[in-house]
Amino acid sequence: MSKNLLIELGLEELPAYVVTPSEKQLGERLATFLTENRLSFEDIQTFSTPRRLAVRVSGLADQQTDLTEDFKGPAKKIALDADGNFSKAAQGFVRGKGLTTDAIEFREVKGEEYVYVTKHEAGKPAKEVLLGVTEVLSAMTFPVSMHWANNSFEYIRPVHTLTVLLNDEALELDFLDIHSGCVSRGHRFLGTETTITSADSYEADLRSQCVIVDAKERQEMIVEQIKTLEVEQGVQVDIDENLLNEVLNLVEFPTAFMGSFEAKYLDIPEEVLVTSMKNHQRYFVVRDQAGHLMPNFVSVRNGNDQAIENVIKGNEKVLVARLEDGEFFWREDQKLQIADLVAKLTNVTFHEKIGSLAEHMDRTRVIAASLAKEANLSAEEVTAVDRAAQIYKFDLLTGMVGEFDELQGIMGEKYALLAGEDAAVATAIREHYLPDAAGGALPETKVGAVLALADKLDTLLSFFSVGLIPSGSNDPYALRRATQGIVRILDHFGWRIPMDKLVDSLYDLSFDSLTYTNKADVMNFIRARVDKMMGKAAPKDIREAILASSTFVVPEMLAVAEALVKASHTENYKPAVESLSRAFNLAEKADASVQVDPSLFENEQENTLFAAIQGLTLAGSAAQQLEQVFALSPVINDFFDNTMVMAEDQALKNNRLAILSDLVSKAKTIAAFNQLNTK
């Protein structure tokens, strides 16, 4: 007869960003534990609040399934001695399995007999197996952990309760310094300690203590309450998904309310207001029906609506203090001169091993000038890039960015416009930070894109040059994100700038502040980012073939990946790739100094293939270029069918290998086709 299992771990408040991943991890780890221990179940449901992680297993078998395993031992000739008795090898084998030689039987495997034993293990009761669930809790991993009291162990937060129920029976377990039972804790202010009467009553028992344990239900409550406020007040509320996910993990019993602030603060840039409300106070932004910011906000209380007016006033007071700071910095920063701020950047450290921000900007300016030419920017755009590169970090020394660092670049754009800088320059100051997250927005202007590329390239090369190279998951300076940004920007703008030649040219530059080193590591790092970009849709063999090509032009590589993926589903893909692979493999034996001599051709097939290679222009899109190369497949096959490439005559052999080398030289600009898998 199946039962339902409940496990709840009660803790001090968890960081909001940890709650949802930890809830998921607990469910996955418990499912693995049950499967590995042969306890079948029907369903697993997880729960979480800032103060608890829980999981309920429905339809849990009351006993493990029986286990029958066959074990293969030594060969019969080793298992028996000269007298036909079991040898020490055979005896040791069965003893290791907890059996005796009586269990031995011989089975033939590929013409030879081997010792086999069959071990039967009766399933244990579920209650006995579940004593091991503390292993699941101990195995949980978190971004940070802590010690508390005088304990030697550490965990994400101090543990207060452990509830383990099999239907309505409490199981006796010990985890860290806690003994399990059926007691849980209600809402910190509105509830008390409470008894969970059964696994099935979990939600109801805690609801009576003002705790909504289902995160999805809390989210729905918050959204519904906000929608009600929208209707009542005739406004629109920006329900930012990331903020919503954070807020629902800050509360156990949500109550949304609307507060207000003086309209005079609307004169502050909208980004400052939104940052103050959303990022610092976890408030939802309120707009009118036309989308204009209103002097209101929506917040979510961890509790009911008792004394809600006092709560509203308290939140308003806290926000106004933030807005006062924003208003002050907005006013005072406008008194500053960009040139003065730029001059002070010589005293701001970019990194202690690399130098100052001013030196970083100087290198970026040189790189940006080179990129502007490669990207064929207009004279006006080149001028804008150069000016932007001279000043683009100045806002880091403003009071506003000092207080609200999320606004770096954004305030730079605004202050630059107020100071009379060209709009293209101001926009580039903001856009050079983009993309600021995986999948984040890209620069929209060429000037901003070039500055972003230059800034990211110097950052990458500088950190690698002083040995600060990411390893494993450790990437404290976000170099993977910066490099991914480089790849995405190049692809977005379609700039066919060969990365290998570009990086070579950067390593030829000379700076007093820094000498670039570790070029090979940089190139491998960039290749890994391109590989990741292709990996979204392309299998490993296609990615490896493209990365082994003779071209390192990001937009072309990504386009070839897409074209090869599509082509791999067509009928002619396999024969075309196989003929090209054969050519690639033979071409490796060619003498690079040998040029094709048509006078040495002995058959029409040599003439035909050579002419086809000479006429191969590889023009058009990646798909069209691939089609042109694949179209050579019959000609290549005809050549192989009628020509002995590895002829005894050395001149003929070298000439035929040179033909194939010419073919590979052109085809390899698309991909190394012999890396592709056709099985």
Swiss-Prot record:
Catalytic activity: tRNA(Gly) + glycine + ATP = glycyl-tRNA(Gly) + AMP + diphosphate
Molecular function as annotated in GO: arginine-tRNA ligase activity; ATP binding; glycine-tRNA ligase activity
Location(s), subcellular: Cytoplasm
Pfam family of the protein (one): DALR_1
Domain of life assignment: Bacteria
Disulfide bonds: none
Main location: cytoplasm
Keywords, in A-Z order: Aminoacyl-tRNA synthetase, ATP-binding, Cytoplasm, Ligase, Nucleotide-binding, Protein biosynthesis
Entry GO terms, CC: cytosol
EC number in record: 6.1.1.14
Group of enzyme by EC: ligase
GO biological process, one term: arginyl-tRNA aminoacylation
PANTHER family in alphabetical order: GLYCINE--TRNA LIGASE, CHLOROPLASTIC_MITOCHONDRIAL 2 (PTHR30075:SF2), GLYCYL-TRNA SYNTHETASE (PTHR30075)
Family: Belongs to the class-II aminoacyl-tRNA synthetase family.
Subunit architecture: Tetramer of two alpha and two beta subunits.
Name used for this protein in its record: Glycine--tRNA ligase beta subunit
Gene name of the encoded protein: glyS
